[in-house]
A protein has these predicted regions:
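GST-like domain detector, emphasizing the conserved glutathione-binding G-site
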Residues: 1-123
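Short, contiguous strand/loop micro-motifs
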Residues: 3-4, 169, 193
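Aromatic-glycine hotspot motif
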Residues: 48, 59, 132-140, 190
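Non-transmembrane alpha-helical segments in soluble domains
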Residues: 62, 66, 80-83, 136, ...
Length: 198
């Protein structure tokens, strides 16, 4: 039986959980522990073990679940672009969240001096914030039909938005398309059952 290792609050793990739930395959979820994290060569979640096969990236896990169950994974360029943009923003948002654990004021106070190699932490932080804002505006331009069957682009976007709402990392005020999309996705039982606060 396949085992997916992760934490319930991870948006990457959530996408894998949704794909596996839709697959009809036999699998189980294991909350990662300090001991089990060592089963992954990257020492991060999500990872899946199926016999001798270990997959260490959520996109690969989702693809594997889709292929094993005869379902499509990113069937169009448009869906792949939605998936990629949502993943890029998600990566940036998670990175900033982990850097300051939700305390943007503390990181904003980082000294503005640069390191010996020219790295300026404050400039880095500000640039990442700009990427998030621009990326979310870009996502709000997509035509988002939130009706089943959902694509992996839709699911990745919903995982991003719901995690950002849960962690209060992205302001969706005035982004009506994204808000409406997330509201509809939260009504889908497979997505609702994997909410980060459950």
């Amino acid at each position: 039986m396949m085992k997916l290792y992760g934490v319930r609050t991870s948006p990457y793990v959530r996408h894998a959980r949704v794909a596996l739930a839709e697959s009809g395959l036999s699998w189980q979820f294991e909350q990662v522990t300090p001991d089990t994290i060592n089963l992954s060569p990257t020492l991060r979640v999500s990872f899946l073990i199926d016999g001798n096969l270990t997959l260490t990236d959520s996109a690969v896990i989702v693809r594997y679940a889709r292929e094993q169950s005869g379902q499509a994974f990113l069937p169009s360029v448009g869906d792949h672009e939605l998936f990629a943009l949502a993943t890029s923003i998600l990566d940036t948002t998670v990175n900033l969240y982990l850097l300051n654990i939700g305390d943007s004021a503390a990181l904003a106070e980082v000294a503005t001096g640069t390191s010996a190699i020219g790295f300026n932490p404050r400039t880095y932080y500000e640039r990442q914030q700009e990427r998030i804002v621009a990326g979310v505006r870009g996502l709000d331009q997509f035509e988002l039909d939130a009706s089943a069957p959902f694509t992996d682009g839709h699911i990745r976007l919903a995982c991003l938005l719901d995690w950002a709402s849960y962690r209060e990392t992205i302001d969706l005020l005035g982004l009506n398309k994204l808000n409406d999309f997330l509201t509809r996705m939260r009504e889908w039982p497979t997505f609702a059952e994997t909410a980060p606060d459950l």
